[in-house]
Design a protein with these regions (language model features):
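C-terminal capping/gating helix-and-loop segments adjacent to ligand/active sites or protein-protein/ligand interfaces
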Residues: 148-152, 166-218
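Extracytoplasmic/periplasmic solute-binding protein
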Residues: 1-22, 64
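Alpha-to-beta junction loops
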Residues: 61-70, 86
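Short helix-initiation/N-cap motifs at beta->coil->alpha
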Residues: 46-61
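Pocket-flanking alpha-helical
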Residues: 54-57, 74-80
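Extracytoplasmic/periplasmic substrate-recognition and gating elements
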Residues: 41, 80-145, 196
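Beta->alpha turn/N-cap motifs
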Residues: 52, 69-74, 110
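Glycine-centered hinge/linker elements that transmit conformational signals in sensory
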Residues: 18-48
């Protein structure tokens, strides 16, 4: 997530890379890698290998000052340590002076899908209606701290996690969205290659000038 944000903030254009009007060896890509290495000095030594649960637990247990994470972590954080809610704020990923739009956000969604050939169409539709009705969506917002999908839903912000309003205020300024970089490339192999390149930079195994050009055939 951090590497993807840094690339986007530097103005990396995945569509341009895909049609070969831009390249991973361009200055903005290398600079994103350099900033990733700079930031790596502020993380715990185990950061590259920690699971999502380990990283989140380190935050809500007070072992880490900051967590780079999506709003989906709100319920996990508050559920495991309710006393932590009053200490936990939210801010958007910072911009880079003179670079790309700082109000672009990584946005992911929860999706309910039904097979067109299911033998239980009525039951599947009923389940989707249950998950998307006002009662379920109020629970999603007021307990889970996640964005409801029902337009103009009345949310009791005294009941909802405090972090929900922080995130909504940030998203109100969003000018565009993008996905995780490893999921946005041409293939699963390319996504894995991107992850591996960024991990090598983060750990100091290779410099950005070494790690990225080594993998351009796959990326």
């Amino acid at each position: 997530m951090i590497a993807g944000y840094l690339c986007d903030r530097q103005g990396v254009d995945l569509a341009a890379i895909a049609d070969h009007t831009a390249n991973w060896t361009d200055e903005n890509c290398i600079e994103a890698g350099t900033k990733l290495k700079d930031l790596s000095q502020y993380f715990q030594a185990t950061a590259a290998g920690d699971s999502n649960d380990q990283a989140t637990a380190a935050f809500y247990n007070g072992e880490a000052a900051m967590l780079v994470q999506g709003s989906w972590a709100i319920a996990q954080i508050n559920g495991n340590n309710p006393d932590f809610e009053s200490k936990c704020g939210v801010f958007q990923f910072p911009g880079i002076d003179g670079a790309n739009d700082p109000n672009r956000m990584i946005v992911k969604t929860d999706n309910l899908l039904m097979s067109s050939t299911t033998e239980h169409q009525d039951a599947a539709i009923a389940l989707m209606k249950m998950f998307t009705d006002e009662t379920a969506q109020k629970y999603t917002a007021e307990v889970g701290g996640k964005f409801p999908i029902v337009k103009d839903l009345e949310i009791d912000y005294d009941k909802a996690p405090a972090q929900l309003k922080y995130v909504q205020d940030i998203m109100a300024k969003a000018t565009g969205t993008f996905g995780f970089y490893n999921e946005s490339l041409a293939s699963v192999e390319a996504g894995d290659c991107f992850d591996n390149a960024m991990v090598d930079i983060f750990l100091g195994n290779q410099t950005p000038e070494e790690s990225i050009p080594d993998r351009t055939d796959i990326l």
